[in-house]
């Protein structure tokens, strides 16, 4: 077995900077897009369709073809090239519907919008196909699809292709993985797929991996509470060294609190710092990706700590005496 060793930015998802609250919505979206371009974020165009549905006619009508119904979503937003690549990869095995956040929602976790309404817009992707954007989180997008917006269920939920790996502890932050989890909560088999940061993003290998995962899930099925997390190394299509089924590894975060002062003298803060690393222990997702292999990792919604469960049952759980409230 290899030694536990830190890996420099193993696809480091990193945390994305939040838009300052004093910006208008349109300015924030424009600056976010510019920042993504500076970072090399692969962005595909997605334009709004003209016209507005009449109230009461807002639900799309989808005919049943007999092919699997596949819901595709992500957390990078509807304009992401990774989303388009995933949609195109899965069209060969099912009827694909794209429902994704209208803006980048990286690292939002399993956030669900309950205190305001959600709005859905029809969008046209770069290949001319129809998609739907939601002004909420990845979880919102999946919830909307399962709660009746399309009037039918789903045979598979595919979330990605995320630009940046989601390895080890990343899954607790990841909107990509959380979208797949929301599918599982709604009894839909699901997987999440992410690719390491790549100087010249090419999602060919990740698209092939997504197709293989989808076919396996549709053929073999998943038990209740199960989903699959897939991570693809940043290598050319011909350079990867196979597929490995792994366990989750250990992410090493290097977050720093960065304080700044605005023109009015009021301090504000960013969460920044160097990219995270990870421990490339043999058998983990980190080890597989470092060695140019695609990591396929099973995940379960049941987060019960089994070993701690036994210990807790040996502790003294006698409560303190209730306070005397008599006058």
PLM features per residue range, with description:
Residues 156:
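Short, Asp-centered acidic motifs that coordinate Mg2+ and/or phosphate
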Residues 73, 99-101, 135, 159-162, ...:
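Short beta-strand segments
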